[in-house]
Amino acid sequence: MGATNIKEALAYANKQLKPKIDSALSREVYQVVVDAEAFSIDEKVYDTYRPLMYKRRGDMGGLADKGNIIMKGGKATNGVLRVINITDPNPGGVLNRDRVTVGKSLPELIEYGNNNRWGYKYDFQSKGAYMKPRPFTEATVRYLRYVGSHVLALQNGLKRQGVKSRITGSSDENLDDLFF
């Protein structure tokens, strides 16, 4: 190592630890985030109403399909894991071909609602629960903060690589507020 002072020793330790953190984020933590998002989608999106205009794809190509919840950039870098949902609209599942939403980010349309900050609108206008925001990403973050499974996953990922760690702190969020 050759460190002559604490500052150099910490810099060396950081350099050794960063790739291990990124690896744990890209494997163990990513899987926990995907599972939590799929759960949140069921709670905040699918349980909100039953569609009449289209057939839901659910976890078979739809918003809750874990294959549509991906790591942006393919891996965590510099201690940051970015997870996005890339689900496309479902023109094949509509009951009326004149009323199909295409050419828009379906996750953002659902997350932020009709006529959101990007100007996305459903192509079929009517009143309904689907027009309102159904913030599944926010619910995912709140769930993870409360449960802490991502922290345990990080610890397990570091352990896999021979790094000992200890979890400290706790959540003070009320579970009753997670999905209501």
Q: Whereabouts are the PLM-identified features?
A:
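Short, Lys/Arg-rich flexible segments
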Residues: 1-81, 112-180
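Short, internal acidic amphipathic alpha-helical interface segments
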Residues: 79-125
